[in-house]
UniProtKB/Swiss-Prot annotation:
Belongs to the thymidylate synthase family. Bacterial-type ThyA subfamily. GO terms for molecular function: thymidylate synthase activity. InterPro entries: Thymidate_synth/dCMP_Mease, Thymidate_synth/dCMP_Mease_dom, Thymidate_synth/dCMP_Mease_sf, Thymidylate_synthase, Thymidylate_synthase_AS. Disulfide bonds: none annotated. Keywords: Cytoplasm, Methyltransferase, Nucleotide biosynthesis, Transferase. Its EC number is 2.1.1.45. The lineage of its organism: Bacteria, Pseudomonadati, Pseudomonadota, Betaproteobacteria, Neisseriales. This is Thymidylate synthase. It is an enzyme of class 2 (transferase). It comes from Chromobacterium violaceum (strain ATCC 12472 / DSM 30191 / JCM 1249 / CCUG 213 / NBRC 12614 / NCIMB 9131 / NCTC 9757 / MK). It catalyses: dUMP + (6R)-5,10-methylene-5,6,7,8-tetrahydrofolate = 7,8-dihydrofolate + dTMP.
Length: 264
């Protein structure tokens, strides 16, 4: 995945050193875009090993509408532990906004179900959008959404997705985000009778934390390897019926893991 290495190199060479909420410090740029053709392989970073199990379970958790980390803990996923309260709750984060956005009249809007219906009935619509950024509830969220809005686009039987990510932790977060939204695009394409197209990843504040700079430089010394292939169970036609066992990654041969600390 040369696109990801190019992003890291660009930030190292052209980024601005800035303070941040966590007190760690970052090197960042504003505005950057990557594009991945999903027909060319599943975009899972190969220059270090990524924990696909966490990516899949987190996505299924988002799609379920859940905002408590209990499901994640039961499946050995700890990526949200630092932000949960003593009961495991995170407030009205991604799952709530995706599946139960509160309307002023008291209704709750299931953005994902509406999206699927619109793709099937009006694939040329320019309104195939899901937003997790709800200004009225941001202060109640344990962590305001970093990947805040995504849009789908249908052309020639192919489904493409563009994500706008307001805040992008390049070393730890972005590899997860690329794989997660690529997988979501494949899942939505399957249940809508389409082929996966491109995943376009647009970043706002794209940053390397100051305690990730050496790890990034190490990763840049490694050559990308061929992308793996992601196989979905073709029998699944309901987006909300996917389970962990419906996914099979083939041909993933990454370089060794590179350890780095999460900035909380």
């Amino acid at each position: 995945m040369q696109q990801y290495l190019d992003l890291m190199r660009h930030v190292l060479e052209h980024g601005h050193d800035k303070a941040d909420r966590t007190g760690t410090g970052t090197r960042s740029v504003f505005g950057y875009q990557m594009r991945f053709d999903l027909a060319a392989g599943f975009p899972l970073v190969t220059t270090k090993k990524c924990h696909l199990r966490s990516i899949i379970h987190e996505l299924l958790w988002f799609l379920s509408g859940d905002t408590n980390i209990r499901y994640l803990k039961e499946n050995g996923v700890s990526i949200w532990d630092e932000w949960a309260d003593e009961n495991g709750d995170l407030g009205p984060v991604y799952g709530y906004q995706w599946r139960s956005w509160p309307a002023p009249d008291g209704r709750h809007i299931d953005q994902i179900s509406q999206l699927l219906d619109m793709i099937k009935k009006n694939p040329d619509s320019r309104r195939l959008i899901v937003s997790a950024w709800n200004p009225a509830l941001v202060d109640q969220m344990a962590l305001p959404p970093c990947h805040s809005l995504f849009q789908f686009y249908v052309a020639n039987g192919r489904l493409s997705c563009q994500l706008y990510q307001r805040s992008a932790d390049i070393f730890l977060g972005v590899p997860f985000n690329i794989a997660s939204y690529a997988l979501l695009t494949m899942m939505v394409a399957q249940v809508c009778g389409l082929q996966p197209g491109d995943f376009v990843h647009t970043l706002g504040d794209a940053h390397l934390y100051s305690n990730h700079l050496e790890q990034a430089r190490l990763q840049l010394t490694r050559d990308p390897r061929p992308l793996p292939t992601m196989k979905l169970n073709p029998e699944v036609k309901d987006l909300f019926a996917f389970t962990f066992d419906d996914f099979a990654l083939e041909g993933y041969d990454p370089h060794p893991h590179i350890k780095a600390q999460v900035a909380v």
